[in-house]
């Protein structure tokens, strides 16, 4: 049972890794589209056959992933996300920061004044 729980905890990290690999593959396939084909001698090597087969297997998956996530990478979607994030978290950051600094300053001054009679001035009750 605990093994299943550990696997479920690792699922988001695994999904993120798969997404990153898919994005990298999509970007690389776009970069290689304009490159010339390798010379015939290299074309027949074992490694080129392996890479060719892997490309043949992964290309449809990458194309589907790229097509499905195209809406996310569009400027309007990303701009909308950033605007929402700003509205939710950063719009009133200046006033909140000023209020926090004033509160912290007042708290620090109050603590300092409460310590002053004991440390610097001595107890008022003793004198």
Swiss-Prot record:
Keywords tagged on the record: Lipid transport, Secreted, Signal, Transport
GO annotation (BP), single: positive regulation of triglyceride storage
Similarity section: Belongs to the apolipoprotein C4 family.
Signal peptide range: 1-27
Bilayer-crossing regions: none
Subcellular location per the Swiss-Prot or TrEMBL entry: Secreted
Protein name, per record: Apolipoprotein C-IV
An annotated GO cellular component: very-low-density lipoprotein particle
Function (record text): May participate in lipoprotein metabolism.
Pfam families: APOC4
The keyword Secreted is assigned to this record: yes
Superkingdom of origin: Eukaryota
